[in-house]
Amino acid sequence: FKGQYIIFDLPVFSALQEFYLKSIGINAKYGANEDTNGVSCIFKIEALKEVLSNKKSKKKSIFIATWSISEAPIYLRSLFLSMIGNFDVFLIAYQRQFGETDNSTYFSAWKDSLKNYQWYNHEIRHLPNNYYLFGKNTQ
């Protein structure tokens, strides 16, 4: 894939990701990367908002989150998910229950709020009570 990548993580992991990606010759920047073929290693919500608002609507995009969102506090995941409704495709992996949170109910309500998507929720056979949520923009 040639295009823009956005990695959102804790500051220390963002720095580590930038270091590693640069060491293998990938154009990565700690923070917002203006290059449309680069990697932005972001750890601040404000920077994420900025990068997402500058996302080229004509280019294809995919959002991938493997267990990260389902393990975040509700206030943070709600803030995060409210910003990402303009991707072409989604892949979110999550466990049914995390702490006191019923993730199946949470993600069901979230996907219902995005009307222009076709959704498929699939249990991961080798990981009982874990799911892949696939979404595709239908417009």
Language-model segments: what does each one mean?
Residues 76-83:
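A short acidic, amphipathic alpha-helical/loop segment
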Residues 86-99:
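Conserved beta-strand signature within the Rossmann-like core of class I S-adenosyl-L-methionine
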Residues 1-5:
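Conserved S-adenosyl-L-methionine
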Residues 10-13:
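Conserved SAM/SAH-binding beta-strand->alpha-helix loop
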Residues 61-75:
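A short SAM/SAH-binding and catalytic strip from SAM-dependent methyltransferases
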Residues 52-56, 104-139:
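Rossmann-like AdoMet/SAM-dependent catalytic core
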